[in-house]
């Protein structure tokens, strides 16, 4: 018997418009009301019964994925402040063990264990280590942990000389924290208790109660997020304040125990900048003269004194930079692909780093020692596992430090492509795709199309060892780099937000049509997948073109756009006004309502649909997908599968652990494979 949620009408009126929400009652901020939990359990039980027929397939896929993970894995060590650091995974362990040794030791000598995350996680269903930081004198470790999956971290401190933990706990914090140079003062960011926005900077002295901590800065504008880091010079603690369109930096002297923050450059609307400091100069990435950012250098805060090192360019986005004593390395993006350039700080000679794959991603890795000439950078493509390189910038010599081992994987068996399709308004949209060479048959393969397209985030064409379980079964996997993402620069992002949000949806649907027309998939075997804001994309796609898809997976989907954006008590809502708009404005209200998936469910046939959520999700509250599924059950006219799977122990990121985290992936893949093979839907067992 299908789950059925009670219909309890709830009227919401704004701008003279009344919306009736029959499933508003599914919202329970306490996550404890029996009727709500009972409905979620009904949906879970139904989903388990439906998928029981595919348990063997799901188990097989999970085993395939886990078999591609080396049982014992050791990271490439790095040296910082006189110590060599690494983390290792031991056979059968879900979490990493973090270790260090003197930089003067040989790597085969004994390592000191800083943290065994397996022991920390032993009594919890969920565990996330958000970050650790060790004092400049190497004696105390700060550790941020989340045991609930709400991204509300607690920070604890351990004396590395005695092994003892200090008594204090800093709770409800962001995993963004910095030690002052005296190794005793600690700066951290606290979250708002209701909205969970990171909004306050506090100063803590080791060994004292958290109640004695001093508030250093509080952000009053609830569209801004607060984060911390230390400059390369170690002279400053940076308080970075950022909304979606504007930023400001305040600095603390890292040498002073009682430092007070000062503004580097006051915020002004639509000016975004970030900075670093090294060798008595500030280096700034700023969009003051162009949307795609330029790089500037100065000794003082006066903006008139900024020296332009790299001008903003129309078709190249400056994404980041890293400072070395003799070199400056920049990370850029052009026509959807990332690239790296090294610039000699004395001669201004520029050297590019070349790559061969048609679709790939590269990034500047962790480089904690600026005095070196050795650059670490990462590389991945849809057919190349993550690879860490070390480049001697003085000589040009390059070596592989580590490539992720994937047992049984042979790159020659797979082919990746980078295409451009033309959307309905004439704009070219990039698509990255990959498939197994031997299994590709033009016009006959199942095609899975992934989309996101929000916040200016770029969905790069990187490697996935779990995805191989689909490719090896004949799936073609495609990523549509729709407007609203950052793949083609700032304008690409702006053309898919606010009152242009529908470009995101149109790009995705037009790309699906084009891929089918080009023969990358069978029209009867087209599947869609997206999560969070990409889940909203899924909701819009099936409202507008349900016949296009055989099956859809919506992961933790943001689908009740108007109601959520009208409720400023919901975590993150106010910070989203500069992404979607504020529906208190009638123009934005009408526009958002016209595409919001929940508000546009109609009596029509929908494709097979698997929806996932986590009870403790802090980014997209569980009741959004729950309400959406309930409304779909009420109105849809087909007999296709509709499954809602709620993880009662996790949040936005799903299960934790390097093996357990793939249980949900295996279920999703089994759902897709079974649909493609015609073994779903099956009559669920009672």
Swiss-Prot record:
Biological-process GO terms, alphabetical = proteolysis
Recorded GO CC terms: cytoplasm
State the PROSITE patterns in the record: PRO_ENDOPEP_SER (PS00708)
Q: Which residues form a coiled coil?
A: none
Report a single Gene Ontology molecular function. Answer: oligopeptidase activity
Question: What reaction is this protein's catalytic activity?
Answer: Hydrolysis of -Arg-|-Xaa- and -Lys-|-Xaa- bonds in oligopeptides, even when P1' residue is proline
- Gene3D superfamilies named in the record: alpha/beta hydrolase, Prolyl oligopeptidase, N-terminal domain
Homology family: Belongs to the peptidase S9A family.
User: What functional role does this protein have?
Assistant: Cleaves peptide bonds on the C-terminal side of lysyl and argininyl residues.
NCBIfam families found in the cross-reference section: PRK10115.1
Indicate what this protein is called per its UniProt record: Protease 2
Origin species, per record, is Escherichia coli (strain K12)
